[in-house]
């Protein structure tokens, strides 16, 4: 019911306990809620070897600390405040009453971020979030941030209305600003009885946003039911499980309807609830009403004041079907969510008066957050596209016949690239359990089957292509793979598909100890989803992991897997919206080893580059931003500069041993920049170890430098490094300004001394 209570033992034990209400979700800036700000709260040490601390600023709601703020001076990186919070948690300073914290804010007054409260081991700096306004303009200085986020009512809303507990991850989630603006835009439109759509780029958390929209619409008295519509073709498994995970600790009911009878029962009930279903079940229900079935409920359901929330709104509902449902549900509002709207540039073919664009189908755009903005804000990663071609020919690209790409030799070249030339994309050198995954998408089910069979033949030693020993050193059982697609029961061509899928399932069962059959295809697909998503702890272990999944279209839309780093494409270029959707399977934020979403194409490189650029222009509102990573020449130049810089400082790894402690600190900074550029360079297919000879540099040299860096690295200097990076590195310069470096070091050490000064107890 949105009320938090605490259990208190009475002094007279015979009277038992009493539950006291302490905070109310909807009592915002009025009623029973009170707000306080406390500064410099002293927290005693929890362990003998620690020290007492003073916490900067805490916001209390009804006496409970719910938002904590750590402040630094402008000369210090805001990340230092983040690392200080992690240190305080390690020291046990956020226990007791402070365990009620929901939100951390870190700032150096000019740069501010927030993050959901969690234990130190779960706090990831990559999820620090900046605030933007409704037009996606950043508001990151402390004054602007405090006015927008930390004032009342927004601060209360942030921790009580715009937070979600993900039950599957056992984690608290705070919504990002663009999600909040979208939710509020839908609420405003619903009060005006207007429909509309939300354009949020793929990978930006549309499922969570749509969950909150569906949930919050029920707070509007005029709306009796919210129907969340998902696509029957493969999406409902992950989306529904996400909904159920969000709702497990919420105050509303989420119902998944497995059949039409359940749908009628849910919609005919008197309670307010969110119903998750497919458009096919809705149309089946309408048809049964016309046939005279469920007459007791038909009239009531037809007159419902209902809001439809449609995930992947173009795939889930066609204009024709939506028109029919609107004609039946006279009192309906429609809110579509899409990462790739259909514009006049890529509109559907005209069929009568049916909608051709997203605007025509759903109404006004209520909020937008494009791929360009998401990459700029760090909500998703950028893309890096590797245009490969297996065919060397004097013919012009457009003159190469399609049959050339059907040849077995082409397929072997593709698989050789995946198996032996994609180690960096898949993070294979990180070893067992830490590698990333990939999808190979092809044009048809027979083509997917052919790739599956050929890959099995390679692993059986029957082909000229082998998995290299270098790969096997890191992952002896690479690759673990499968194929996934929908199989119809009744289509004549599906008989062969079913036979092949039986063999696929047998292989899968043998690999993972499962027991799937064709009768449980949905269960198999769901298991593949979960194994690829790796969101449950058991999938962090190598014996439960997949490396590669072969698909046609399945998983290319609406599927979320942060560990998935690469999509390999061996098919003709897709439409702009489908390209962006497919690419966006790869650019979820995961960890520091995943810098980009990697896309590798294997045919028609010039045509692909043209189509991809057109798609990015369309979905970035006319500009690329940093959607595509730098090209090879740029990255090579950055590598050369950082290698020269580190050699100027320490010509050989052995020279690091003779550095002073202060110089070793600088070495850590320089090596991190070099390490980043070297890893980036190796992610290109153009890279070959032999090219290092030109620089009189080897992998062994790199490993020796890395050993030195690990020996002297200090985690708390990460903020210092990030501050230095913009100040001191320039790809057009050969050396670092040492005087500037010394000055910044002095500033940092002075700030560090002030931070570490222990609290003096009053006598």
Which residues does each PLM region occupy?
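Conserved RecA-like P-loop NTPase helicase motor core
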Residues: 94, 283, 307, 315, ...
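Conserved C-terminal RecA-like helicase domain
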Residues: 273, 402-548
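Inter-Walker segment of RecA-like/P-loop motor cores
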Residues: 247-288
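Conserved helix-turn-beta segment of the N-terminal RecA-like "Helicase ATP-binding" lobe
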Residues: 234-259, 457-465
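ATP-dependent helicase/translocase motor core
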Residues: 1-225, 234, 238-249, 270-273, ...
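Conserved RecA-like ASCE P-loop NTPase motor core of nucleic-acid helicases/translocases
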Residues: 199, 224-232, 434-444
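Long, hydrophobic alpha-helical segments
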Residues: 588-698, 708
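Signature of the SF2 helicase/ATPase Hel1-core->accessory helical subdomain module
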Residues: 78, 280-401, 411, 556-613
